[in-house]
Amino acid sequence: YDDFSSMDYESHVFGQKSYNGVAIISKKKLKNVRTDLIKDKLKQSRIISADIEYKKKIVQLINIYTPNGNPVDTEKYDYKKNWMDQLIKQLKTSSKKNSNIILAGDFNVIPAAEDVYNVKSFEDDALYRLEIRKKFREMLNLGFSDVYRHFNESKEGYTFWDYMRGAWQKNNGMRIDHFLVSTNLLNKIDDININKKPRSKL
């Protein structure tokens, strides 16, 4: 906190020690910080939201960490589906009140075949299963745009590489971290890039 404060950033964190956690860090004043947007039956630290003012409009920021869901034949997968359903329900409500929303974080969703190095090996994975991808598209259909795909229609853009089997060196990655924004905010965005430098040092 002190490091961010020394650089004039305001930070809000919702975490579980050694487990889940989300945060919002901003140079603009944050208001209406919430960690109770959805009904999470396991009460895990997976979502935080805050409002900022931009050109006299309120923009809602939502940072998420969606459950992984693997293995698919366990309660972990059911939890992921329920969690995503609760998020979609909340987005429907939020979208009616505010048409300026930025939803970002680790979605643990591979949206399409071009978003993973070997799609066949993930066909029955909780990150790529059809019903999970449908839930992701349901979010988009609420009036959101996938910012990376908006600027890069077919370009590879991995955000995660496993720490085993030389995944980084082989570029065996996947795109599971996303920025979804209300469509009317797209004209406020100039570009989007994935910073691979921190991962290259691990």
Model-derived features with residue positions:
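Structured beta-strand-rich core segments of catalytic domains in phosphoester-bond hydrolases
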Residues: 1-71
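Surface-exposed cleft-lining segments at the edges of enzyme active sites
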Residues: 38, 66-85, 120-124
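Alpha-helix C-cap/termination motif
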Residues: 53-55, 93-97, 142
